[in-house]
Amino acid sequence: MMHLIISMESGSLNHELLKFFEYDSSVPTNSAFYQQRSKLSVSAFRHLLKEFNLKFPLEKFRGKYYLIACDGSEFNIARNPNNPDTFHEPNGKSVSGFNMVHTISLYEVCSKRYLDLEVQPGRLKNEFQAICSLMDRYAYGGSPIFIADRGFSSYNVFAHAIENNVDFLIRAKDLNVQRFLGVETLPDKLDTTIELILTRTQSEKKHKHPEKESQYRYICKNIAFDYLDPDDISDEYLLKLRIVRVEVSDGVFENIITTLSEEDFTPDDIKYCYNLRWGIETSFRDLKHTIGATNLHSKKTEYVAFELWSRLILYNFCSIIILHVPVKSRNRKHEYQVNFSLAMKICFDFLRGVAPPNVESLISKYILPIRPDRNYARQHRVQKPTSFSYRFV
């Protein structure tokens, strides 16, 4: 059953069943598929993804670090106005409203592989909670560096990383950094280490270290922080952070909060590593439009999660094969890479057992130039899922 779900493409469910069972007259019905699918759980797909990744060691940055990008993405699912957790009212993106789930993924940028996933109803998304859960159950060892955008900047996220003994690079807004430092303006360039004492009380008389009063930061009961008891106002938590401010383009500066030491990572090193985070953005494009994660075959959120996990497994399967395909270097203007779209189609057939004569040789025939300096504005599209009715059959 899991093999079937992983190998599904963008056709209708009947078509996918026919292909998987090689057009046998005893092919299972849709109803039989639904009954067997209900016996599965998300934990089975999570276990399969982890065990599959562990069979193929991840590539390390500088021979030591795993660079793990974390980011969110959205997937439109079948319209159901009666589901308040996923339904969005009509707006500029949709005239009839739409249903959506939100995902937060971990992606190792050097190996080009997904490591873990959190799926949340679109209306109940909580990226802070998601990345904390992903850090808590990280299971790949080594020296991971979590890299995330400014939407993940929070005291609770920093503390979870420190408590789980993982490093991080997280971009932060100017306003947040000003509050950390207790200043009104920021210099163009900055590289400093700060110590903050987090507490649930605003009373200076109850602070344990009055000589460090400027380092105290108050967290109210309504703000999640898992290492302070909300009912114990005497509880305190020491947080040590490094703040680096770098120029990303002419006159444009960004703040990056990290736990990496100055001895091991200069500001330029941090800027370089953070820029590698863009790999997860391009992987979302391949995941949605090449692997076909937008062409779902399920309506219920639980079963949508099955398909999203299966797309990650399939993406990793294709990525592992593609990264082992040698691309011949020739005297050309550009460096070249494998055409992921065509390579994925070949890997699809290979997974189904329709083995081409030589998978790696066939994939290496289809290559594309690498143009690293290309930039395009992000397009805003109408929010609409792929219909169950109008698909290739």
Language model: regions and residue ranges:
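Short alpha-helical "recognition helix" segments of helix-turn-helix
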Residues: 16-23
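Single, function-defining residue in the core of a domain
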Residues: 1-11, 19, 33-40, 44-48, ...
